Amino acid sequence: MLQKLTPFAGLNKDLGVSDLPLGAITDCNNVRFREGYAELFLGQANAYTTCPIPPYSAFPVRTGSTIYWLVLGAAKAYCVTGAPATWTNITRSAGGDYSASLDTLWNGGVLNGVPVVNNGVDAPQYWSTIATGTPLAALPSWPAGVTCRVMRPFLNYWFAFDVTKAGTRYPHRVKWSHPAEPGTVPTSWDETDATKDAGEFDLDGAGFIVDAMPLGNTLIVYKQFSTYACTYTGGSYIFNFRPLFSGIGMMAPDCGVEIDGTHYVFTQSDIVRHDGSQVQSILDKATRRWLLKNIDNTQY
């Protein structure tokens, strides 16, 4: 006998079978839920031919009506667009191959239409003209002998986190540029120049800085075990930093996403969501245990 179960209660891995509400299921595979129904997920198809390098990171970049994929590996950078797609090597022409690794990967973003990427070992790279004939190049005005683990854009500024200067690592340090004009990159990162807005600030508390994501007009900075809010104030300090959550940080770079004004973050032991003031776990009991048990020890 077939019976229609309404209302559909979705996937629930926490409760035992005898405790499940009517219409709930305990596991599923190759389906997705939409408008209260489960439907077959149709799978995937190749959008492009095989990338010439093992891809460590990929960034979509739009110029006009054209979308490029900027793909970065351990030593090379490629871009691809169009159909049929053609992969083009856009590795920097000065400085040789890159020195990225699976431990550092690549990060960055796009500010004012200019992509900037960073691997924590080499000087940050920018794509001055988004075109197959233009290779990446070292970010102008970036200070010599300085690297950072993570770079992110916010407002008209670029931010660098977990900074190393002349071989000395400052894992709590936030460094920001002078604001960039539209279509350009920053003209200065010199925190000692009183005519510029560039600056530095060290966040207190245990744990290193891991990553940062905008949330409205606030940049949320995640350390390993705490979270800070960075807001623009102008004046002599330019930015204000204040503690937001203690005991809640981010597990690794890119372990967070913003959806409809809410951050969803993979912490050291949970997945939480917050709106900048209220924080809430979205896992419960068995699901949390399953997630932590099944993290890939090799890749993590």
Give names to the regions the model predicted:
Residues 103-151:
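Hydrophobic or amphipathic alpha-helical targeting/insertion segments
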Residues 2-7, 115, 165, 205-300:
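Beta-sheet-dominated scaffold domains
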Residues 81-84, 129-132, 232-235, 277-278:
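Short loop/turn segments that connect beta-strands within beta-propeller blades
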Residues 94-98, 183-205, 284-300:
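Surface-exposed loop and turn segments in beta-propeller and other repeat-based domains
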Residues 76, 123-125, 226, 270:
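A short loop-to-beta-strand structural motif that recurs across blades of beta-propeller domains
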Residues 42-50, 87-98, 134-141, 195-202, ...:
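A short beta-strand motif characteristic of beta-propeller blades
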Residues 1-87, 146-229:
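N-terminal beta-propeller domains
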Residues 52-61, 95-110, 142-153, 207-211, ...:
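Repeated scaffold domains used in trafficking and secretory/extracellular systems
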